[in-house]
């Protein structure tokens, strides 16, 4: 018997650095990055049924249902288990900006895969769920696996990391940065030398997309310049969001309270285990 409903988090992420080490024959780029999960994000409420219909509320303006990552995630899981009668109503409470570089759509898709696998009782293993997620986007597997992680390849080769749990100020300028546009731009740095995990912990790293994004989007540059007054500011992903780390919640909130009014954002703590995995029963995570 299907559970009536369940509300689950879809946490944000930050890229603590992002090195582009080469371009592959298939057009994708080889990357090195660290995904830092946060204790803030979207929420999804799932109500499973046997109608064969996937309903998403509210509709996202300008995004057809078939292109909605939540819908695509539900559909790909249902197709994988060949259970066309499975359905669900999914209500998305959106807190993360689209096109912000903080993983909103990818995290929503991952929460949908993990949550519906549990509610539909389809018994798909976490490894297979991550593989299904990869078909939806390179960032989806880290949210399925549920740990802050070192990533290589196109971002799908993951090693869980134990990161310092800093507090972060995350600011999002009023612009949309296209990942496709940035990764296809002729001026993007694509030849950064690979580093080791130990080198990251010793010296950190940069975001190879940041100089280009700042040049193309003055709003991002201005946000970086403002946040740099309080700590080293970095772009996450291809933007548009930028962030800086602080040692305490109080320190982060003091900076955030003085942000320019035109910048949206939030304060959140870095976590090593996803809030999604903290919320779910153990058997949902292990596949037992």
Curated annotation (Swiss-Prot):
Native organism: Saccharophagus degradans (strain 2-40 / ATCC 43961 / DSM 17024)
Active site: 13, 139
GO MF, any single term: 4-(cytidine 5'-diphospho)-2-C-methyl-D-erythritol kinase activity
Keywords carried by this UniProt record: ATP-binding, Isoprene biosynthesis, Kinase, Nucleotide-binding, Transferase
Job description of the protein: Catalyzes the phosphorylation of the position 2 hydroxy group of 4-diphosphocytidyl-2C-methyl-D-erythritol.
Pathway in which this enzyme or protein is active: Isoprenoid biosynthesis; isopentenyl diphosphate biosynthesis via DXP pathway; isopentenyl diphosphate from 1-deoxy-D-xylulose 5-phosphate: step 3/6
Record EC number: 2.7.1.148
Reactions it catalyzes: 4-CDP-2-C-methyl-D-erythritol + ATP = 4-CDP-2-C-methyl-D-erythritol 2-phosphate + ADP + H(+)
Family from the record: Belongs to the GHMP kinase family. IspE subfamily.
Protein name as catalogued: 4-diphosphocytidyl-2-C-methyl-D-erythritol kinase
Gene that encodes it: ispE
Binding site for ATP: 97-107
GO biological process terms held by the UniProt record: isopentenyl diphosphate biosynthetic process, methylerythritol 4-phosphate pathway; terpenoid biosynthetic process
């Amino acid at each position: 018997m299907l559970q009536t409903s369940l509300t689950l988090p879809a946490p944000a992420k930050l890229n603590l650095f992002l090195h582009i080490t080469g371009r592959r024959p298939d057009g994708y780029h080889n990357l090195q990055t660290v995904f830092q999960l946060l204790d803030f994000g979207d929420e999804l409420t799932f109500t499973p049924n046997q109608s064969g219909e996937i309903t998403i509320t509210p509709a996202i303006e300008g995004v057809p249902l078939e292109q909605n990552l939540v819908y695509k995630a539900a559909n790909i899981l249902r197709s994988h288990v060949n259970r066309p009668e499975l359905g669900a109503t999914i209500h998305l409470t959106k807190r993360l900006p689209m096109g912000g570089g903080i993983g909103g759509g990818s995290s929503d898709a991952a929460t949908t895969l993990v949550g519906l696998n549990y509610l539909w009782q389809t018994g798909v293993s976490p490894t297979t769920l991550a593989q299904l997620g990869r078909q939806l986007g390179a960032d989806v597997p880290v949210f399925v696996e549920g740990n802050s992680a070192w990533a290589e390849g196109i971002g799908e080769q993951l090693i869980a990391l134990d990161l310092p749990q800093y507090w972060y100020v995350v600011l999002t300028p009023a612009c949309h940065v296209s990942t496709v546009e940035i990764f296809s731009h002729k001026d993007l740095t694509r030849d950064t030398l690979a580093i080791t995990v130990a080198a990251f912990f010793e010296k950190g790293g940069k975001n190879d997309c940041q100089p280009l994004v700042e040049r193309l989007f003055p709003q991002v540059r201005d946000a970086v310049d403002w946040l740099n007054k309080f700590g080293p500011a970095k772009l996450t992903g291809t933007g548009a969001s930028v962030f800086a780390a602080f040692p305490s919640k109080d320190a982060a909130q003091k900076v955030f309270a003085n942000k320019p009014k035109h910048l949206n954002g939030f304060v959140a703590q870095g976590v090593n285990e996803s809030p999604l995995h903290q919320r779910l029963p153990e058997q949902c995570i292990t596949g037992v």
